[in-house]
């Protein structure tokens, strides 16, 4: 995707660290990420455009919106991700003008006034970084809960691993944070009222310029300035004082951590207060500024210094909840939610069954299509610039690959595994360069489920042999998927019976093809919760239904909706089905 990250800060902030960390990871995953901000200090990959969001006069705001519209159109931006109030306001208007999907990560409490309640200016989805912000948005700004998803700060956890505790002759206490605003007031009071600057080696790690009021501490505490090697500084510390990302990174390094932010003091982090710490972004979020009992801080400092390391269980919990890979995957999922919902378009997944080359092969039950008409389908798809994807592609690249701005994708699936798939379909796929996913029944040699049907029974049509299945899998054009042994209505079977049908089919196909299966198709599109549970248990990455499941395929990877193709689906009919909005129109 083409993504624009929007920030507004004049010094390094947690929002900037978040945006660049997530942005760089998105870039590594193949996305193109641009940045627009007043300043940008942290290392980033992509283009940076300077825009003074902090200049908020009416003419300036018009300029902000106009410039953002220009950037969106010039760089074919598919989604804007804002990270501050100033940037989100202008981005919201620009995205309204251009019809561009937008999300906003909310890093702190929002001001409450009438205009803010009426005009949230957060785009299509807001991502509060903790539960306290989510609660405030709902209760004080009337933001619908459905528009909110808690998305925590993503941290490159591998860069902050525990080491042996330092052996400092004089305990090192490191305070990390800005010297401006409430954080600056907090730091000043810690130095002035709470810390014994003679007894401890106090170091203030900040990206802010030194304010005059801090000069009185220059001979008793050190102000080394900002560093890109934060982990090394944390590991050298006997106690770290900070909030937000600082506290998380310190705990990942195994250091005793006093979580105190611009709202409240959590205390030295342990398993008892960890949940409260996470909910308040480690003290940064609360209804009041500096609602802190400073007289108790000295005791907390002593408590922290008495511990050589933090509880390993706390370090593990931080890793599980803030791991960058997991957070970015969640962000990608939100991007897909917003883009698909806003544009009302989804990649078409087509469902075929049999292919015929003469009238005698027509059936009475299972859908079929004349091979000449199928070729017209492929010709149309080629002419429209489509490329094919398989579920193996999704397993390797993620479902967000379907939103690649330079591609137009569809997926071709074929159920049951009839001989005509090998004899008639495969040559045409090779001719036009398309791939397909073929779901194969292995416990039958013909379509017995149709032949023995109580109503309108069909003629027998042969299924592929093991040799043909193997040849299909090795062709480079076919992904083989599971489709049970005997093509039953799964919802009518017990859990044990379902598992036997699905598992045995999977084992047989993997034995034939020599590689693990990625996806499974429920016969008739019939399933229940047991069916989905078994598909996951057997390590299928995806499972497809027919006309059930969410309209956006990524929202339930074990009940993916497909578009059925019938004998009379003409080229014009196919064009309507592959435009992208078919499932949305059909659902209305």
What residues fall within each predicted segment?
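C-terminal active-site subregion of NodB/CE4 polysaccharide deacetylases
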Residues: 343-413, 419-420, 492-588
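Short beta-strand->alpha-helix junction loop in the catalytic core
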Residues: 132-133, 151-160, 180, 209, ...
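A charged, aromatic-enriched C-terminal amphipathic alpha-helix characteristic of glycosyltransferases
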Residues: 14, 163-165, 286-336
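A conserved, positively charged/aromatic
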Residues: 96-97, 101-131, 135, 142, ...
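Conserved catalytic-core segment of nucleotide-activated headgroup transferases in glycan assembly
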Residues: 172-210
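Acidic anion/phosphate-binding donor-loop and adjacent secondary structure
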Residues: 138-139, 146-147, 154-170, 181-184
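N-terminal strand-loop element at the rim of the active site
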Residues: 5-60, 207-213
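Short His-centered aromatic/hydrophobic patch
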Residues: 82-88, 106
């Amino acid at each position: 995707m083409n993504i624009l990250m929007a920030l507004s800060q004049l010094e390094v902030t947690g929002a900037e660290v978040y945006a660049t960390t997530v942005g760089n990871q998105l870039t590594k995953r193949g996305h193109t990420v641009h940045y627009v901000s007043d300043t940008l200090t942290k290392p980033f990959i992509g283009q940076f455009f300077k825009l003074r969001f902090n200049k908020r006069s009416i003419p300036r705001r018009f300029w902000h919106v106009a410039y953002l519209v220009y950037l969106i159109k010039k760089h074919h931006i598919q989604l804007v991700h804002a990270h501050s109030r100033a940037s989100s306001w202008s981005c919201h208007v620009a995205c309204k003008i251009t019809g561009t999907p937008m999300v906003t990560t909310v890093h702190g409490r929002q001001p409450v006034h009438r205009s803010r309640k009426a005009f949230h200016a957060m785009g299509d989805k807001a991502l509060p970084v903790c539960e306290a912000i989510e609660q405030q948005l709902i209760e004080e700004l009337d933001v619908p809960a459905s528009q909110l998803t808690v998305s925590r700060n993503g941290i490159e956890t591998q860069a902050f691993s525990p080491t042996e505790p330092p052996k400092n002759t004089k305990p090192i206490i490191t305070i990390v944070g800005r010297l401006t605003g409430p954080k600056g007031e907090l730091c000043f009071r810690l130095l002035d009222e709470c810390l014994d600057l003679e007894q401890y080696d106090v170091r203030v790690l900040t990206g802010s310029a030194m304010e005059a009021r801090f000069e009185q501490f220059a001979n008793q505490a050190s102000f080394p300035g900002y560093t890109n090697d934060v982990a090394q500084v944390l590991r050298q510390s006997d106690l770290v004082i900070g909030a937000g990302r600082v506290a998380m990174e310190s705990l990942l390094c195994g250091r005793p951590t006093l979580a105190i932010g611009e709202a409240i003091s959590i205390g030295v982090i342990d398993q008892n207060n960890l949940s409260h710490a996470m909910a308040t972004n480690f003290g940064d979020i609360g209804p009041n500024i500096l609602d802190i009992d400073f007289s108790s801080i000295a005791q907390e400092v002593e408590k922290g210094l008495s511990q050589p390391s933090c509880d390993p269980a706390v370090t593990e919990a931080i890793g599980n909840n803030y791991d960058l890979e997991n957070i970015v995957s969640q962000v990608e999922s939100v991007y897909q939610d917003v883009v698909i919902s806003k544009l009302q378009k989804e990649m078409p997944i087509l469902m075929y069954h049999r292919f015929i080359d003469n009238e005698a092969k027509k059936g009475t039950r299972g859908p079929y299509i004349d091979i000449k008409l199928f070729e017209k389908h492929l010709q149309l798809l080629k002419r429209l610039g489509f490329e094919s994807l398989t579920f193996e592609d999704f397993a390797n690249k993620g479902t967000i690959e379907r939103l690649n701005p330079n591609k137009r994708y569809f997926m071709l699936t074929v159920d049951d595994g009839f001989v005509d798939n090998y004899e008639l379909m495969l040559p045409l796929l090779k001719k036009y360069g398309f791939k397909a996913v073929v779901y194969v029944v292995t416990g039958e040699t013909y379509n017995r489920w149709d032949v023995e049907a109580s109503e309108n029974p069909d003629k027998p049509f042969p299924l592929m042999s093991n040799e043909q299945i193997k040849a299909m899998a090795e062709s480079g054009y076919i992904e083989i998927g599971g489709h049970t042994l005997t093509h039953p209505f799964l919802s009518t079977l017990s859990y044990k019976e379902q598992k036997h049908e699905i598992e045995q089919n999977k084992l047989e196909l993997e034995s034939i093809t020599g590689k693990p299966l990625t996806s499974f198709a429920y016969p008739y599109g019939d399933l229940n919760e047991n069916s989905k549970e078994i598909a996951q248990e057997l390590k299928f990455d995806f499972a497809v239904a027919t006309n059930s499941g969410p309209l956006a395929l990524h929202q339930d990877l074990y009940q993916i909706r497909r578009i059925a193709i019938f004998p009379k689906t003409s080229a014009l009919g196919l064009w309507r089905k592959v435009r992208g909005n078919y499932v949305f129109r059909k659902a209305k």
